[in-house]
Amino acid sequence: MFTSIKDSSVVVTGGSKGIGKGIARVFAKQGAKVMIASRGEEEGNETAKFIRSNGGIAEFCQCDVSDWESVKNLVNKTVESFGGLNIMCANAGGFPQTKIIDMDPNEWDQVMETNLKSAFLCVKASIPLFEKNGGGRVILTSSITGPVTGFPGWAHYGASKSGQLGFLKTASMELSKYNVTINAVMPGNIYTEGLSDLGQEYLDTMAASIPLKRLGEVEDIGNAALFFAAKEAGYITGQTIIVDGGQIIPESLEAIEEI
């Protein structure tokens, strides 16, 4: 799809499962060298092994994205393994579902560290390498929850994802000095391993509420991230792409009908 991705060195945080796994696989198919980062060692190694078994290049690094030393180690290992860093996909995130009245303040802090602080750390750790390269790409995985809509039990998640977009705007201005673009993909309802626990009836109802009548696939998010990383998107920074199958359109139509 995008020949400029071939031989690029890419980090995907939260790359062992879900959306991150999809992003890693999409980049690997385009010939990128992918460093998969996650806390889960077994899952991370399995994902890297799967990519290699399909002809791709991938390694795994265990990483706590909320810890500065761990993120620096991730970047250093990427350089050791692949000779540099070209693309940072800050995808890692957590989304426990707890209503505000029941939420422990520590849970709020944990979600902010995993979802928001991690984006800052990944960008900060990448800048020296991007400066050395003469440029680079950062892609954040945000969400429609928070910036566009809300969902009961996800006040902390929504706040963290909204915070990512605030960070994105200022980061795009600061990173331009290094010829680095930073953009965000905002997924809607994407089918991942975790959703299977909800049951088929619930998933069918969820899909029926989406104009395209299906849940998104992790590769849909990977393809959007791939676009932002490509040479063809080199004049785009500080922007977002909503990948939701038109999920938020009915809400807009309902608002218009009420006028």
For each predicted feature, which ranges?
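The beta1-alpha1 cofactor-binding region of Rossmann-like NAD(H)/NADP(H)-dependent oxidoreductases
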Residues: C63-N73, P105, E219-D220
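Short C-terminal tail/terminal secondary-structure segment
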Residues: S4, T237-I259
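Alpha-helical segment proximal to the catalytic Tyr-Lys
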Residues: P128, M173-E174, G234
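Short, small/polar-rich loop/turn modules that mediate ligand/substrate recognition or access, typified
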Residues: S176, T181, I236-G238
